[in-house]
Amino acid sequence: MELGSGGKTMESFLSSSDLLLGFVPVFASVLALPGPNAAFAVGQSLKYGVVRSLFVPLGFMLATGIHAAMVLSGLGVLVLQYASALVILKWLGVLYLLYLGFKAFTAKSSVLAVSPQPMSRRAMLTTAMLVSLTNPKALLASLMLYPLFIGEAGSYAAQSVALGLVAMVVSFGVYGGYVLAASLIRRRLVRSHLANKIVGAFYLGAAGALAAK
């Protein structure tokens, strides 16, 4: 028995929904692996607390949307042809994280809660985007992962938009979780003389993880 246009539309929708549901745990597990994004999120949360640091997962979320748009529009393959530009961007990100780590290690105050010149929310958001966008392996992982969850049935454009939006929500949830988890131990570190050293270690860890990519 042949399906009418309405039946085919419903079948296409269900197929796309199944693919999206399958995408969520796979993508979340990839993002949850320790790396430069996670280290930067933890470092910012330890230094500034959960409320201000929510701009970090927001920045990662926007970067995820950019990666998704690049891959699903076909621009990702084109960008990879300019490998030297990606390398330059990556090392700029590494140098900036090293700078943040150096500042944390040399900070005179050991009290995290009273930073004389706290990073602005805009700087936090743009730095998070920079950390994520200068990671070549993030783009490579996106190139390999996203096409697997686009079904043959249904509109490619509609599926791409849905997949990109879901990826952004998952990204915010995963890195928001890192920020929240780090904030839970922040109270114990606020008065510790090692507080800034610990924050600096996370920044340096993020730089090392990005450099190793």
What is the predicted role of each segment?
Residues 1-18:
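Short, strongly hydrophobic alpha-helical membrane anchors
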Residues 13-87, 144-163, 168:
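Juxtamembrane transmembrane-helix termini in multi-pass membrane transport proteins
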Residues 28, 32, 65-66, 102, ...:
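Hydrophobic/aromatic residues within the transmembrane alpha-helices of Major Facilitator Superfamily
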Residues 35, 135, 200:
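Short, conserved phosphate/pyrophosphate- and ester-handling motifs at nucleotide-, phospho-/glycolipid
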Residues 51-126, 181:
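Membrane helix-loop-helix hairpins that form the core translocation module of multi-pass transporters
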Residues 70-72, 133-143, 203-213:
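Hydrophobic alpha-helical transmembrane segments in multi-pass integral membrane proteins
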Residues 80-109, 168-178, 188-213:
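Selective transmembrane alpha-helices of multi-pass membrane proteins
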Residues 125-133:
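A short amphipathic helical element positioned immediately N-terminal to and/or at the very start
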